[in-house]
Amino acid sequence: MIDLHCDTIMQLIDHPHDGDLFSNNWKIDIERLIKGHSRLQDFALFVDLEEQDDSYGRYESMRQLFDSQIQKYSDYISHVRSYDDITVCYENHKVAALLSIEEGGVLGGDLAKLDKAYADGVRLITLTWNYPNELGEPNTGDSHKKLTETGIAFVERMQELGMIVDCSHLNDGGTEQLGDILDVPFIASHSNAREVTARRRNLPDHLIRLIGEKGGVIGLNFAQSFLGTSSISRIDDIVKHGLYIINKGGEDVIALGTDFDGIKPNTEIEDISDMHRLYDAFRGAGLSEEQTEKLFWKNADRLLKEIL
C-alpha cells in the first residue's frame, strides 16, 4: 500500500500528549503502518497561512519534528529522497516516508526556499490550499485563473529538481496549465470526482483525463464531505469514486490519498491498518487483482520511480 497524503505530523505537533509517530491516538502511526503492510506513506507538512504569523517557521518546526521522529524510529521507517531509497526500504521491510508540503505559499514565492526544501528532503508540494498565494489560485477561488509567473517558475524548478507537483486544492485553470508546462506526470494527491460529488475540491472529468494522459495519479480522498451526502466516510462511496475515476482516466491513474488525520475521524475504515476492507470492496466491485494492486500501490510506485 502507498498512501499519498496524511496530516499526522500536524496532529503530533498540535497534540504532543496524544502519542508520537510510533504510536498515537490518530489514524496513522508506525505500528499501524506495519500492521497494514504499508510500503510508503507521504507525510504532509500542512500550514494554514491565515492562522500562522510565521508560516515558514511553522513549516520548519514541523519538518524538524518529522526528522526527529524518523531518526528515533529508524529501525522501522526511513525518510526517502530518491527511488533508490524507496527500493532499499522495500528490501529491508521498512516503511518508506515521503515528505511533502501542503500549501506552497509557505515558501513565499522564493526559489531559494524551494531549493532548501529540496535539500531538506521535501519531494512533493501541494501548490495551494484554500487561499490564493504567490503561485496560483485555489479551487475556492476563480476557476479560470492561471498560475502566476512565480508559480510557473516554481513548477519548472520542481521539474528540474525531481519534485512531484500536486494539484489537489488548485483551481481548474491552474491545473489545466500544468499539462502544458510539465514534461513529466503530475498528481492530485487527495482528490475525488466532481461528477460523483459536486464539490469544487473534486476533479472534473477533463482534468481526470488530463492527469491520466500525463501519466499522473489521483489519490482517493476519504473525507466524507468530498465523497457524498453521508455524515461518515463510507467504503461504498470511496469505491464509487474510484470506479468512476478509472472509467474516465484509465486504470493507471487511480491511487490512494486518504487524508487521514486531516479529516474528520468518522470513517468506516478505522485507520491505516484497516485498509484491507477497502481492498476487498474494490475486488467485490469487479476490479481484478492486478487493477486493485495498481490502485493500492503500483500506480503510485511507477510515478515515484519516474520522477524521483
Model region roles, listed by residue range:
Residues 1-220, 225, 239, 243-246, ...:
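Extended, charged catalytic domains and RNA/DNA-binding interfaces, predominantly
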Residues 46-47, 262, 297-302:
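A short, acidic, flexible beta-alpha connecting loop/helix-capping segment that sits on the rim
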Residues 178, 198-200, 230-231, 266-268:
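Short, well-ordered secondary-structure micro-motifs
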Residues 222, 248-272:
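Short acidic/histidine-rich active-site segments
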Residues 233, 240, 244, 249, ...:
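C-terminal functional module detector
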Residues 270-308:
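Mid-to-C-terminal alpha-helical segments outside catalytic/metal-binding sites
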